[in-house]
From Swiss-Prot:
Record NCBIfam families: DUF167 family protein
Family affiliation: Belongs to the UPF0235 family.
Organism annotation: Persephonella marina (strain DSM 14350 / EX-H1)
UniProt protein name: UPF0235 protein PERMA_1406
CC per GO annotation: cytoplasm
Length: 73
């Protein structure tokens, strides 16, 4: 399964919104440096989708706000 995410780093509070099926807007409080925001996005996706973090892989957009994640079965 492929999930698209629009990330908003340095937010005042963390939030995850499902814009449409398999497309999320995620706000994280951490800065976009040294992979901190990406790690936090994976943690939030994991909790929201109720799956282990190890099943979520960043496929595209490591340094972009628009990201594509693969959920591994």
């Amino acid at each position: 399964m492929i999930v698209k995410v629009k990330v908003k780093p340095n937010a005042k509070k963390e939030e995850i919104r499902e814009i449409q099926k398999d497309y999320f807007e995620i706000r994280v409080t951490v800065p976009p440096e040294k992979g901190k925001a990406n790690s936090r996005v994976i943690e939030l996706l994991s909790k929201h989708l109720k799956i282990p973090k190890s099943r979520i892989k960043l496929k595209k957009g490591e340094k972009s706000r628009e990201k594509i994640f693969e959920i591994i079965d």
